[in-house]
Amino acid sequence: MALPILLDCDPGHDDAIAIVLALASPELDVKAITSSAGNQTPEKTLRNVLRMLTLLNRTDIPVASGAVKPLMRNLIIADNVHGESGLDGPALPEPTFAPQNCTAVELMAKTLCESEEPVTIVSTGPQTNVALLLNSHPELHSKIARIVIMGGAMGLGNWTPAAEFNIYVDPEAAEIVFQSGIPVVMAGLDVTHKAQIHVEDTERFRAIGNPVSTIVAELLDFFLEYHKDEKWGFVGAPLHDPCTIAWLLKPELFTTVERWVGVETQGKYTQGMTVVDYYYLTGNKPNATVMVDVDRQGFVDLLADRLKFYA
């Protein structure tokens, strides 16, 4: 039986490719998709979810828009990374359907209530919507199998020296998620920076030759340009968000450790930092499965294989 998942995302190039991968995988049953503000404004990330589902001919999937800002802070967006639309690069179709007439939290709650088995929440943006769900519906915690997030790192940052972007946008929300008691799986920069897509991988995807693989290649063309900055020291572009889906499909591609994780919400230099107790110094019981390594070639091969689904 396919694993039921609920995807909360802020497309964003890598979020879009995570959607592509999830919907090409019969092992997963995507029950709903909710959008969060993050990589772009809430209006644009919602539109991008609708555009991607229109492209993939999956307008049957319920979609809802989430919180317009973080729990306690002003919104920060990553338009310098993802462009004015949030998905700059390819010519994507305009949406042919509308979102549900409800909030993201309402759609999440409805999805959990209606599911006959616990649902895995995959969150590839800031954790605002998930935190609001957890706070407003404690009775539904038992309906959540796990929360798989793209966010954080062990002592590494890509937005500040200490913080990864998704966690930095709403650290209070991330702290709620990590301390919820629900199993959390963390795909942080330690693993996603190893999941780099190279130029030759992009050409491999393009050569598959179907409309979706072509769009994915064009998304990566744009994404690669940003990551050419020598400050990163990258060969290609880290494909952050699809690591969450890839872990669900092929966990054997990833090396993980069980550790306690907390989120710094007040530090002068470290707001948004995920504090990973790697050496068990706090005495706290592990609350997260933390990805630390990936078989890069296996990851690329998985994506290439699933792109053929859209032929």
Curated annotation (Swiss-Prot):
One of its GO terms (molecular function) is purine nucleosidase activity. It comes from the Bacteria. Gene3D superfamilies: Ribonucleoside hydrolase-like. The active site is at residue 240. GO terms for cellular component: cytosol. InterPro entries: I/U_nuclsd_hydro_CS, Inosine/uridine_hydrolase_dom, IUNH, Pyrim_hydro_RihA, Ribo_hydro-like. CDD domains: nuc_hydro_IU_UC_XIUA. GO terms for biological process: nucleobase-containing small molecule interconversion; purine nucleoside catabolic process; pyrimidine nucleobase metabolic process. Its EC number is 3.2.-.-. Pfam families: IU_nuc_hydro. Keywords: Glycosidase, Hydrolase. The keyword Metal-binding does not apply. PANTHER family: INOSINE-URIDINE PREFERRING NUCLEOSIDE HYDROLASE, URIDINE NUCLEOSIDASE. HAMAP family: Pyrim_hydro_RihA. Belongs to the IUNH family. RihA subfamily. NCBIfam families: PRK10443.1. Hydrolyzes with equal efficiency cytidine or uridine to ribose and cytosine or uracil, respectively. This is Pyrimidine-specific ribonucleoside hydrolase RihA. The gene is rihA.
